[in-house]
From Swiss-Prot:
The record marks Y207, N241 as: Involved in dimerization of the capsid protein. The lineage of its organism: Viruses, Riboviria, Orthornavirae, Kitrinoviricota, Alsuviricetes. It comes from Alphavirus salmon subtype 2. It catalyses: Autocatalytic release of the core protein from the N-terminus of the togavirus structural polyprotein by hydrolysis of a -Trp-|-Ser- bond. This is Structural polyprotein. One of its GO terms (biological process) is symbiont entry into host cell. A lipid is attached at C1312 (S-stearoyl cysteine).
Length: 1322
């Protein structure tokens, strides 16, 4: 049982029942007198008594399941008083007092009742008091519009509550609005922490609210006294018995005889979830203009009344059916039509039997079933009644399927769960129209639904049956009615086209994973969506003997109650006439009567059927529509993960799948090479892993990522060219030897060309003059000026100083272009006879020294880096060593990346269905299609397209039945069919949207950690971002790529996105994607619908009245049958695809250049340099090809105490960088590193001291890892440090180019000044 606590109002309701008698009086026994006739009471009094009884039952049930608590605490011992001694007879005081009480009770006859405590329990009062202390009102326009509650570390209030706090600490707080809930949250000041309530998890049970108890049962919350709540109570908390808050109230609405609530529930970790009721009204105070009283009442004979409380003498459908039907017809558009319908169908004046169960759900279901008394069952044509066509009481009129699951909604002519008079009955009862035109009800009908196998009947309410059926080409409904087995079979192609799913499981799912799904609603609600129109009843043909009995001249007509009998009569010497009878029994006189064409018309309307001729167009009433589609949250299964083992560069998956599970893989590089496979039973799969990484996803489990470490050979892939050549020859010799052969061939060709050129020059005549042609070397030197230099936002001299400090090689290369320019200028000045000695003299060099000195006195330290834009990549780590300062550790990591495309919705599409106008039959006459086909009744209220209307002649010759056509060839029929959207199109998961994609914006968030300070920087693809942290200046961006996984055309359906070249708007074809198109946001009745589903109207057969047509099945379902792969499976670079909004997240592509200016204030100046010495390094263990697979121990002597940064100087061998504390004396540091080769030589720098660590590494146990490795690869993606030094020694020294240029220039000038002619032999 649920724990129960009482409030004051609950005790006041129970007080008269436990009122004690007067003291000292013995109540005599009185025999029970005859019950007097109780006065008639209205519905309001009955409803109030029912509410009190329901509250009393809940309270008694709570007391029955709750143990009695002894509230008597330990006695208080008074000071300075001696305890009383025991009496002389040796009895204890307690026993004596107990005995005395028993004697008093015995003397009074045992009829003395204990006076109850007329107040709630102590626990309840304490919990309510605690909740009030943490609740604060919100004022709007001087009145309380709602409340906010302090729970845990935050303050919560409903988002619809507007206003401000009248509290000094809470007046200026700023709330954050939740995206999917009616909730706002904010942080409150720390000084109010003592007033905050503790959270608790909301489960099934009974809780304490401001206005009584609140009961939760299967995520449905009811309140027995919510009628006392007023506008402005939104946001009030409700607590458990310990005073912990489990949720806040948003509003409520009537649900049967109780009030159902919409709440926000919490758990212990303050995770919120909204339990919403669609008809709940927010309990916030509306603006002043909306506070005017609004009277919504029904009308009858110009009199207004409360729709839920009409006078039963005038409205009861069993007593006055005509008045009741008139009242329903006059109030069809009233917002409270539901209340009126329930009132007129459940207003029996007879005394109701006392029911044991008063569940609100059961009561409401009973009212829904009883509401079918406003309509009558009917008989319609069935094409197959056990082999032959017939007019069946269970004829199948409509079969609806979403196409994505096995559940069918079937409409038949009979009514399930209804008695013959229209009252609520058992589940096996079936109300139907008999062959004689009378309404019957049969119990134990054994209702069966079949396709290729028997279906599971989920629920049957009224005309509708909900069944879970296997796929098939036909549908059969069978039932036993008064001992006769009836069945009806119709052609229906039941196919299940699943949208993209990862698991095909059946049954209950124990996981917590949920997703949006579409299903038929089984909980009727009071809204227009849950109502269906009924029209005038069509006549039912019966045999004349069932209604008329003749005895010679005297004939008696038997008219069933509530019906009209009509037939043709011809007497002797009299013309043929049609007579109508409406009373119960009438007689007439007729000589030699000839009676034909008898029919019975029900007095109550029924549903319109396409298997019957067209009837009246006026809506007479609306009855419950129990199973409309709705979007719900469905739990999905999660398949158990297999055992994962590594073998070389492969991943082995071994496990057992109890049901089909989808296994998808994709590479995390540019080419995704996506694969998908359905597995079931025992399986063993081998999946190769690449160095770029691979993503595995089994069913609905979280994706798994694996990377392959490169298999390294001997030699060094990050060394000098000859070592690099040895490494590649042993790693992949075929490519290495091919490269060597091509290089040798090119070298031989170049040597031959050079020899030929020298030979030609030797035997040629050369005449060189200095003017006007310049020497070749001068032109070649001038070409160096065309080399583009590096550009930056900093001054040029700052860049030169930074290069001089950090990279002498880059400094030399950067100075090559200015030196060439200086040589050219000097050369020009010299030949213009200008003196350049002053430029190259003492003053020039002095100016240069002053500039360099100024550059060295910079006030900030700049650190530049290029970070890969991949959230899965390891973070960048570095130790900043600056002379004279303690080292600082720098970490840069990519938090997330977002690719947001600019989209335009071209149209949406969904499943198209035909809408059929019941046939218009002209007996012995001709009919024609109307000029405006939208005026046809079946098309009104719907958006139609692809409308077809044909007139068929020579139909139904001499047909006996509902058409009553006795002509042979003059009969005509109008058949009209159009295309419209399915009722499932209003659900987001069943609708596909076609987007055109334009440009995309790329954003990334980078976390920069310097010491203990973290700074978040947002960078973009279209510019440079300048950000400031705590004294940091960061310049980042732009992102090096604008890559997007989305094509120019994409399709979004549910939670998946597809790259698909959809047809343009208005160009759809039957059976293809886009056969139904619309742009309007009104998904039920779009005003711009385009449809082409291939409708073709055919000539009807003459066996029954019907509309014959064909059409093509939905193009969207056919497209889904082709099983296209969504982007969540095929997107390159490991992008995560978000459908709504349309985004690509965490794509591992591109890079972000960054520059970090660190001010001097961030550095701590060294007072004493530790000066480590006597460094020794011992490699404890080493495993190459593994992230941080090596371990080393470094020992050294520290001269002074301080801090030193430890990092690796060997490119390609990363070390776990850190800042270590150095003490005077012996020091030991243990660190880890990653080795890319079997032999590793690592240079480690500690402050300014360097130590070498050398060791041989063992092969890795596995070449597959679950995290992206930190060490580099030998794929040639970077230029190694030794190669840069090797090239720098050739061209990097600035003295080399300067001296060589000056020497060559001098020689050229000398040679050019002396004109000489060399004559060679010809």
């Amino acid at each position: 049982m649920f724990p129960m606590q009482f409030t004051n109002s609950a005790y006041r309701q129970m007080e008269p029942m436990f009122a004690p008698a007067s003291r000292g009086q013995v109540q005599p026994y009185r025999p029970r007198t005859k019950r007097r006739q109780e006065p008639q009471v209205g519905n309001a009094a009955i409803a109030a008594l029912a509410n009190q009884m329901s509250a009393l039952q809940l309270q008694v049930a709570g007391l029955a399941g709750q143990a009695r608590v002894d509230r008597r605490g330990p006695r208080r011992v008074q000071k300075n008083k001696q305890k009383k001694k025991n009496s002389s007879n040796g009895e204890k005081p307690k026993e004596k007092k107990k005995k005395q009480k028993q004697q008093e009770k015995k003397g009074s006859g045992g009829e003395k009742a204990k006076k109850p405590r007329n107040r709630p329990g102590k626990e309840v009062r304490i919990s309510v008091k605690r909740a009030r202390q943490s609740t604060f009102p919100v004022y709007h326009d001087g009145a309380i519009s709602g409340y906010a509650v302090l729970i845990g570390s935050r303050v919560f209030k409903p988002a619809h509550v507007k206003g401000k706090f009248d509290h000094p600490e809470l007046a200026d707080i700023k709330f954050q609005v939740a995206e999917v809930m009616d909730l706002e949250a904010a942080a409150y000041p720390k000084c109010m922490r003592d007033q905050a309530a503790e959270p608790a998890t909301m489960m099934d049970g009974v809780y304490n609210g401001e206005y009584g108890n609140i009961q939760e049962w299967r995520t449905i919350l009811y309140s027995m006294r919510a009628a006392e709540a007023s506008r402005g109570d939104s946001g009030r908390p409700f607590t458990d018995n310990s005073g912990k808050v489990v949720g806040i109230v948003l509003g409520g609405g009537p649900d049967g005889r109780r009030t159902r609530l919409s709440v926000i529930g919490f758990d212990k970790k303050l995770k919120a979830r909204e339990i919403a009721y669609s008809e709940a009204i927010p309990w916030t105070r509306a603006p002043a203009l909306l506070l005017l009283p609004m009277v919504i009442a029904c009308t009858y004979n110009s009199n207004t009344f409360d729709c839920s409380k009409p006078s039963c003498q005038d409205c009861c459908i069993t007593a006055e059916p005509k008045k009741a039907m008139t009242m329903l017809k006059d109030n069809l558009n009233d917002p409270n039509y539901w209340d009126l319908l329930i009132a007129v169908t459940t207003c029996s004046s007879a005394r109701k039997k006392r029911a044991v169960s008063t569940s609100p759900v059961a009561v409401y279901d009973t009212q829904i079933l009883a509401a079918h008394a406003a309509a009558s069952p009917y008989r319609a044509y069935c094409p197959d009644c056990d082999g032959t066509a017939c007019i069946s009481p269970i004829a199948i009129d409509e079969v609806v399927s979403s196409g994505s699951d096995h559940v069918l909604r079937i409409r038949v002519g009979s009514q399930s769960g209804v008695t013959a008079k229209g009252g609520a009955a058992g589940e096996t009862s079936l109300r139907y129209l008999g062959r004689d035109g009378k309404v019957y009800a049969a119990d134990n009908t054994r209702l069966v639904v079949r396709t290729t196998a028997k279906c599971d009947v989920l629920q049957a309410t009224g005309h509708y049956i909900l069944a879970n059926c296997p796929v098939g080409q036909s549908l059969t409904v069978a039932a036993t009615l008064d001992g006769t087995r009836h069945q009806c079979t119709t052609v229906f192609e039941h196919q299940v086209t699943e949208k993209f799913t990862r698991e095909r499981s059946k049954g209950h799912h124990l996981s917590d994973l949920t997703k949006k799904c579409t299903r038929f609603s089984t909980t009727p609600k009071k809204s227009a969506l849950y109502l269906v129109d009924v029209y005038d009843a069509l006549p039912t043909s019966v045999e004349i003997s069932t209604v008329v009995t003749c005895n010679e001249r005297q004939c008696t007509v038997r008219v069933p109650p509530g019906t009209t009998v009509k037939f043709d009569k011809r007497c002797k010497n009299a013309a043929k006439e049609t007579v109508t009878f409406t009373s119960d029994s009438q007689t007439f006189t007729c000589e030699e009567p000839v009676l034909t064409a008898a029919s019975i018309t029900q007095g109550k309307p029924h549903l319109r059927s396409s298997m019957l001729p067209s009837g009246g167009k006026e809506v007479k009433a609306r009855i419950p529509f129990p199973f409309p589609p709705e979007t719900a949250t469905c739990r999905v299964s999660i398949a158990p993960l297999p055992s994962i083992t590594y073998e070389e560069s492969d991943v082995l998956l071994a496990g057992t799948a109890k049901y089909p599970v989808l296994l998808t893989t994709r590479n995390l590089g540019f080419h995704s090479n996506a694969t998908s496979e359905w597995i079931q039973g025992k399986y063993l799969r081998r999946i190769p892993v690449t160095p770029q990484g691979i993503e595995l996803m089994l069913g609905n489990n979280a994706p798994l990522h694996f990377w392959s470490s490169v298999r390294y050979a001997s030699g060094d892939a990050d060394a000098y060219p000859w070592e690099l050549l040895v490494h590649h020859i042993k790693h992949h010799p075929e490519y290495a030897w091919a490269f060597v052969g091509v290089a040798c061939g090119l070298l031989a060709v170049a040597a031959c060309m050079f020899a030929c050129a020298c030979n030609r020059v030797r035997y040629s005549l050369l005449a060189n003059t200095f003017n006007p042609n310049p020497p070749p070397l001068t032109a070649l030197t001038a070409a160096l000026c065309c080399i583009p230099g590096a550009r930056a936002d900093q001054p040029y001299l700052d860049i030169i100083a930074y290069l001089w400090t950090n990279s002498k090689v880059a400094f030399g290369l950067q100075c090559a272009a200015p030196v060439a320019c200086m040589l050219i200028v000097t050369y020009a000045l010299r030949h213009c006879r200008l003196c350049c000695n002053s430029f190259l003299g003492v003053r020039g060099w002095s100016a240069l020294l002053v500039i360099l000195a100024y550059v060295q006195s910079c006030k900030a330290y700049e650190h530049t880096v290029v970070v890969p834009m991949d959230p899965r990549a390891p973070s960048y780590e570095a130790v900043i060593n600056r002379n004279g300062y303690d080292p600082l550790k720098l970490t840069i990591a990519v938090n997330f990346t977002v690719i947001s495309p600019t989209t335009a919705l071209e149209y949406w599409t969904c499943a198209g269905v035909p809408v059929v106008e019941p046939p218009h039959v002209g007996c012995c006459t001709s009919v024609s299609c109307p000029s405006d086909l939208s005026t046809l009744h079946a098309f009104t209220g719907k958006a139609v397209s692809d409308v077809h209307c044909d007139v068929h002649t020579n139909v139904y010759p001499l047909l006996w039945g509902a058409a009553h056509c006795f002509c042979s060839t003059e009969n005509t029929q109008v058949s009209a069919v159009a295309a419209t959207v399915s009722e499932f199109c209003a659900q987001d998961s069943e609708r596909a949207e076609a987007f055109s994609v334009h440009s995309s914006s790329v954003t990334a968030e980078i976390l920069v950690t310097l010491g203990e300070v973290v700074t978040a920087v947002h960078v973009y693809v279209d510019g440079v971002t300048s950000a400031r942290g705590t004294d940091l200046k960061i310049v980042a961006g732009p992102i090096t790529t604008d890559y997007s996984p989305f094509d120019r055309k994409v399709v979004r359906i549910g939670e998946e996105v597809y790259n698909y070249d959809w047809p343009p708007y208005g160009a759809g074809r039957p059976g293809t994607f886009g056969d139904i198109q619309a742009r309007s946001t009104n998904y039920v009745k779009p005003n711009d619908l385009y449809g082409d589903i291939g409708i073709e109207v055919l000539q009807p057969t003459n066996d029954h009245v019907h509309v014959a047509y064909t059409y093509t099945t939905s193009g969207l379902l056919r497209w889904l049958q082709d099983a296209p792969k969504p982007l969540s499976v095929t997107a390159p670079h490991g992008c995560k695809i978000s459908a709504n909004p349309l985004l690509a997240l965490d794509c591992g592509v591109g890079a972000v250049p960054m520059s970090i200016n660190i001010p001097d204030a961030k550095f701590t100046r060294k007072l004493k340099d530790p000066k480590p010495s006597a460094l020794k390094c011992v490699v404890d263990s080493c495993e190459y090809g593994v992230d941080y697979g090596g371990a080393a121990t470094i020992t050294y002597e520290g001269h002074e105490a301080g801090k030193c940064g430890i990092h690796s100087l060997t490119p390609g061998v990363p070390l776990r960088t850190s800042v270590v504390e150095v003490v005077a004396g012996a020091n030991t540091v243990k660190t880890t590193f990653s080795s890319p080769t079997p032999e590793v030589t690592l240079e480690v720098e500690i402050c300014s001291a360097i130590v070498k660590c050398a060791s041989e590494c063992t092969p890795p146990k596995e070449h597959v890892v679950a995290a992206r490795p930190r060490h580099g690869s030998d794929t040639g993606g970077y230029i190694s440090g030794p190669a840069m030094r090797w090239a720098g020694r050739i061209v990097g020294n600035p003295s080399g180019p300067v001296s060589s240029s000056l020497a060559v220039t001098y020689c050229v000038v000398k040679k050019c000044r002396s004109k000489r002619i060399r004559i060679v032999k010809s």
